[in-house]
């Protein structure tokens, strides 16, 4: 249902129509806020992974992190719905984080045996396909009601977002984003090489662990509430880097978040206009 701009302005001036007010304040605005926050989180997650692997095609979807999160959320949804239990925002985030960490752990487990980082990305792609295959298998044998919920969620949509979800998203993204910003100086040193970073006093092992955890949390919160969303984590950091002509993390971190927020929210609004 399309709402004219004049009617939207009237809602904010206090001349409220009950139907328009319900649609605007309970459906449209929460989804738009979620698109902004989750888009920024996804782009930031991609930037962290590209920094970690020194590879421009690394991202949460390519490395199988989103697929691992999708698998665990699918399992939790099937189990909870089968026993008529209500899924909370925390349940979704914990399940998605566990899945994303497991996928990332599998990739890192192979890293000591692999010399080429590009091959490590291919391992992530393989893990992603395995997780997707297992998810499809579970959906095939799930009950009809479970399939409907899983299908709607797995398409990558903001349609189920509520104000309670937005509160959780704001908290998780804000905390993770602030922690990421504090890593800007170690990230800049790490971009110049591990030897240089060590000489600058960076604890490489701890730094890598923090990158993995932060990128997994950001990817998990996106997958938990919007389903698996691809390409944003890969494309936006590269677009931002070329736009600002810099690779400095202190600029790239907020710029990637802003770029992801703009691209996803714009896509969400355009898709809604097309399908409305």
Please annotate each region the language model reported.
Residues 1-276:
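Alpha-helical transmembrane segments in inner-membrane proteins
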């Amino acid at each position: 249902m399309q709402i004219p701009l004049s009617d939207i302005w009237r809602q904010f001036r206090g001349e409220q129509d009950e139907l328009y007010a319900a649609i605007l304040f309970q459906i449209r605005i929460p989804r738009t806020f979620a698109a902004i926050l989750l888009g920024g989180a996804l782009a930031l997650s991609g930037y962290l992974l590209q920094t970690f692997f020194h590879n421009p095609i690394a991202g949460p979807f390519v490395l199988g992190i989103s697929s691992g999160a999708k698998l665990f959320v699918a399992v939790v949804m099937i189990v909870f719905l089968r026993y008529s239990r209500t899924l909370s925002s925390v349940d979704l985030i914990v399940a998605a984080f566990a899945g994303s960490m497991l996928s990332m752990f599998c990739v890192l487990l192979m890293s000591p045996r692999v010399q080429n980082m590009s091959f490590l990305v291919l391992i992530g792609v393989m893990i992603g396909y395995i997780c997707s295959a297992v998810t499809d298998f579970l959906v095939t044998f799930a009950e009809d009601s479970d399939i409907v919920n899983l299908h709607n969620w797995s398409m990558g949509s903001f349609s189920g977002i509520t104000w309670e979800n937005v509160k959780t998203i704001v908290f998780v993204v804000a905390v993770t984003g602030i922690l990421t910003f504090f890593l800007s100086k170690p990230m800049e040193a790490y971009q110049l090489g591990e030897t240089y970073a060590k000489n600058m006093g960076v604890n490489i092992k701890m730094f890598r662990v923090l990158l993995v955890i932060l990128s997994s949390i950001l990817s998990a919160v996106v997958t938990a509430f919007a389903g698996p969303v691809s390409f944003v984590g890969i494309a936006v950091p590269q677009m931002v880097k070329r736009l600002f002509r810099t690779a400095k993390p202190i600029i790239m971190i907020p710029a990637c978040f802003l770029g992801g927020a703009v691209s996803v929210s714009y896509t969400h609004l355009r898709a809604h206009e097309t399908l409305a």
